Amino acid sequence: MKRKQLSGKHIGIVFGTFAPMHVGHVDLITKAKRANDNVLVIVSGSNTQEDRGTRAGLSLNRRFRYVREVFYDDELVVVDKLDEAGIPAYPEGWVPWVNHVKELISKNTDNPEKITFYVGEPEYVTELNRYYPQAQVELIERSIINISATEIRDNPMENWSFITKPFRRHFTHKVLVVGSASGGKTTLVKDLARTYNAPCSLEYAREYQEKYNVRDDELDTNDYIHLLTDQYAQTSDIIDKGQHSGLIFADTNSTVTKVYIDYYLKENISQEEFDMLD
């Protein structure tokens, strides 16, 4: 996919760690978009344990991908990342940090006439005016949507409605019920899903075998490849839709399917075929 470049003459800049991005962030970016031709969103941080997002399981790369996903259909917004690994702590780090920001602006825009930063801390106003005097800096009031990323990390379920959909997959509780065949797993999972008003992912093999009218002892390598990939896709789709309250149930997953493959097929297929299933 060709990299999109912002062609507007007035560019708004919004930066942050976005761990996670919530609707308050989106509200701010929307306001910046209304006041400018385009907005460049910069996801900052690092993939090290010094980064609070990474410590919470949201690496810089993952946050960057998720924020891009939030704005996948917005032609007025471009998302890029700033890896702060190796940049000294503030205040010493301001000069290299601003230089990195300038590089991102040059990379993603076409010689804008006006650049405006939207920040939430007075310190940012002072330092950006000092090290980037060509740009304007606006200190914004906190969004009327009263939520913070810290509150979400501390209690994601209570603040579920504030989390943007791509980030919900990270905070979703996934309950897998395991056990032997014909042991009542599916019934239990359905009952739990009804009780907690949550979606469930059932064993895809049943649907597959009914659709293609194939018995257990007739399943071959190609069938198991479909079972592995489609089981994973089915559960992932439920999680990724984000149309739940942070809880899903499953009566199997691709790992369980792989165990059955190891048991039933390993002695009957070539090593090359077996490796395809890993």
What are these regions (language model features)?
Residues 1-173:
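Nucleotidyltransferase catalytic core that binds NTPs
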Residues 2, 9-11, 171-177, 193, ...:
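Catalytic phosphate/metal-binding cores of nucleic-acid and nucleotide-processing enzymes, i.e., regions
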Residues 57-73, 218-242, 246:
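Short, structured active-site "lid" loops
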Residues 102-108, 127-131, 253-278:
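ATP-dependent NMP and nucleoside kinases share a basic, alpha-helical "lid"
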Residues 181:
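The conserved Walker
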Residues 188, 192:
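Hydrophobic positions on the alpha1 helix immediately C-terminal to the Walker A/P-loop
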Residues 194-236:
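Conserved substrate/cofactor phosphate-moiety recognition/catalytic segment
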